[in-house]
Amino acid sequence: SSDVCSSDLLIVRIFLALYMLYYIKRMKKNPKLNVVVVSKCMPSRSATCMAEGGINGVTDFSKGDSYELHCFDTVKGGDYLVDQDSTLKFCEQAGPAILELDYLGMPFSRTPEGKVKARPFGGASKVRCNYSADKTGHIVAHTCLDDALSNGVKFLMDHELLDVAVDNGRCEGAVLRNIRTGEI
């Protein structure tokens, strides 16, 4: 038998950290939002949990770093093949996302002054890779998951997206399959 699940916001998981930060932003604007996350696997088994290095994002502007410089480093690192407008938007959101994770209680590595610690990474021209020991992805995932669960987000594990119903450019529904049972 097929179940019908209703929500105000359906997030189909691609990258754990990204969808969780998106959810957090939306929930802050509308705390009564009914959110459902669809995932093929448990969040703790996602690729995000395997990431060790850190999160590139400008959190310290005092040493000449900027969103534009972060964008340039990213575009250069992508051999100038990446969409520059999208990259700039992403870079502008990375620093605030790191600060939001810090606010949520993510145990970042710290400087002696207590600030989120950053290190050089990936050929960037400035030190902006914010990290949590060598388990950044795992810790990001669990920080976001803890916050989501404490705010009533519903998770549909072991489900995959088959189709979406679009009306006038707006998603009005989704067809999912339970991977374990095959039910639609």
Language-model features: locations:
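Conserved N-terminal Rossmann-fold NAD(P)-binding element of oxidoreductases
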Residues: 7-12
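N-terminal Rossmann-fold NAD(P) dinucleotide-binding loop
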Residues: 13, 17
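Generic hydrophobic/aromatic pocket-lining and core-packing "Φ" positions
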Residues: 18-21, 98
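Conserved N-terminal/central alpha/beta ligand/cofactor-binding core
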Residues: 32-34, 39-180
